[in-house]
Amino acid sequence: MISIENLSKSYGSKVVLENINLNFENGKVYGIVGENGAGKTTLFKCIAGLEKHNGAIICEYGKPKDFLGYLQTEPFFFSKITGNEYIQLLCNARNVTNTDIKEKNIFDLPLNEYAVKYSTGMRKKLAFTAILLQENKLFILDEPFNGVDIHSNIIITEIIYKLKEMGKSIIISSHIFSTLNDTCDEIFLLKNGQIIKSVLKEEFSNLEREMKAFTIGNKIEKLNLK
């Protein structure tokens, strides 16, 4: 269980997040949706301890960063580190010993090659594998399906189901509504740095229609397509 209370974040005079209040329970999957620039990634970085902020983040396990697996949109890799070394490095950081990484290479990645030579999708799969093997209790997945092939999307989705079954908390951001509909128990709509709506699974279709309405409006008509 993790609770966010009155979390706010500003860069100078620009307010990015304002009075965010959220509760994430164990064994549930949550979606965060919003336009580009709405503050999703900033919120994730605040939870992960990568950004200073006002407000409180309260967790039953202690500091979130000590048990959090954070899959960033564009994971960072050192230039001279192989895929295998990257996984080992992240596991060592949590005092987790994994001697059979080869057996757990579910995405069939070339682990002996430098990670910086990987494609965007391969990098994301490598980073995802690493945080899975860290034995985390909370997972934040920022656009986990972007740039990843359909086969891997299926695997990622099934892993999310498994993590939920194990009692983990999972927070996902995605612009792919069908995926959120398949995986999430609750979705929060973030707009201009504020949570303006939360909906349970049975109401997802209504949220999708609302988002289309305020996102598209009459923009397509303005094109006057012929």
Per-segment meaning from a language model:
Residues 48:
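Helix-to-loop junction immediately C-terminal to a conserved catalytic motif
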Residues 2, 17-19:
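Conserved structural motif at the start of ABC-family nucleotide-binding domains
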Residues 33-35:
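The feature captures the beta-strand-to-loop junction immediately N-terminal to the Walker
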Residues 174-175:
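H-loop/switch region of ABC-family ATPase nucleotide-binding domains
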